[in-house]
Each structure stands twice: as structure tokens, then as C-alpha cells.
Amino acid sequence: MQKTFESKTATSKAVVVFSGGQDSTTCLIQALTQYDEVHGITFDYGQRHREEIEVAKSLAKRLKITSHKVMDVTLLNELAISALTRDAIPVSHELMENGLPNTFVPGRNILFLTLAGIYAYQLGAEAIITGVCETDFSGYPDCRNDFVKAMESALVQGMDKQLKIITPLMWLNKAQTWALADKYQQLDLVRHHTLTCYNGVIGDGCGDCPACHLRKRGLDDYLQNKAAVMAELDASEPKA
């Protein structure tokens, strides 16, 4: 999926898979500069850090997006056992025997992108935007570019509609993602008003879970090397 940084695209409507975290909020901010209509969709799957739903609602209002839908998909909680769906399972820094982190929720992005695709179909939108990333790989197979391409193909063939899944962060590291927020003058908003923490702490988070470690490492790198990281981001933009 090609990253896009132009001020406008040919597609006037986009659906953003929006959790209220750093990555999806950064994608939402960028989308507002590129599309005439930006529709957010947030999923309630009984997640451990379900405070993110209220954060997403607040940010959607603050950023004045076209519409924001919160969808109940708590059935996923019944089917997928994970540290993110069971409070009794502590978030671990170690990988499980199958090589995946215990925060992996099987089928989550398959379900999210399928439902976002149906929503985009009804809205007449031609793009779904999601903040998945392969560069700072967290071990989630459903964040890989190959998976996204496969999902896009399935949606196009299954609904007989031209639909793009756009992944602006796919090849950016976390420092470059912070730079992207700063590029749109929204670094402070993303830093202090998003929720990435698996333990549900807004802003800089608990400081202990894997999500907080990755977020902090990227922020520290960006703040210490702003010019260099911004130059890397600019170099990654597609040339006209």
C-alpha cells in the first residue's frame, strides 16, 4: 500500500480505523488534510484498555471529523483469548511458545478491516486507512504488508468495488511517526491526549507495558534527533 502525503487525493471519502491511540490518531490527522470527508470507526471488543473508546470519541469531536461510529464487536472477546481481552492474563514482555506476544488478538484486524470495508461500501468511500506498521514490528502477523494486501484483494473481489486499504505508517519507524504528527502541528495532541498504553493510561502511559516502551523509545529518538528524523520522513514521501 502506497503512503500518501499530498494535500489532496482523488478520493473524497475515507474510513479511518480509529482506536484513539498514537498511530490511528496520526493517520486521522493526516487524512483530514487529504479527504473531503473523514469517517472514523472504533471497535468495542471488550478490550482491557477500553478507556481508548472514550478517548477516540473525545478526539473525534476535537478534530471535527465528518462522523464517528463505535461498533460493538464483543463477540471477538468471547472467541479470542489474549492479554488484551482477559484482565486475568498479565501483559508479558516475553513471547509465547508460538512466537507471538500474548497481547495478540487472533482475527482482530481481519474483523476490523472487514467491517470497515462494509462501512466504506455503504458510505461510498474508496479508501480505508489503518495505522498498522511493519517497521517497528510488534510481532503481530495482522500488521504486515502482505496481510493488508490480501485483505484489500478479498474486499475488492468480495464486494466488487474498487477499495484501497491505505497504510501511511507501514514503513515508518516510531520516531518517524512522531515526526509525522509534528509535521501537521499536532505533536502535543498526540502525545498528551491519545491512549496507546495496554493498561489504559492516557498520554505517556504506564511506562511499563510493551506499547509504552515502543512509544517512548520513538518519542525520545525523535526529540533528540528532530532534524534528522524529519529529513528521513521527507525522504520517504513519494515524489511527484
Swiss-Prot record:
Disulfide bonds: none annotated. GO terms for biological process: queuosine biosynthetic process. Its EC number is 6.3.4.20. SUPFAM superfamilies: Adenine nucleotide alpha hydrolases-like (SSF52402). Coiled coil: none annotated. One of its GO terms (molecular function) is ligase activity, forming carbon-nitrogen bonds. Binds 1 zinc ion per subunit. Pathway: Purine metabolism; 7-cyano-7-deazaguanine biosynthesis. CDD domains: QueC-like. Zn(2+) binds at C197, C206, C209, C212. Its cofactor is Zn(2+). It catalyses: 7-carboxy-7-deazaguanine + NH4(+) + ATP = 7-cyano-7-deazaguanine + ADP + phosphate + H2O + H(+). Keywords: ATP-binding, Ligase, Metal-binding, Nucleotide-binding, Queuosine biosynthesis, Zinc. ATP binds at F18, S19, G20, G21, Q22, D23, S24, T25, T26, C27, L28. Belongs to the QueC family. Catalyzes the ATP-dependent conversion of 7-carboxy-7-deazaguanine (CDG) to 7-cyano-7-deazaguanine (preQ(0)). PANTHER family: 7-CYANO-7-DEAZAGUANINE SYNTHASE. This is 7-cyano-7-deazaguanine synthase. It comes from Shewanella sp. (strain W3-18-1).
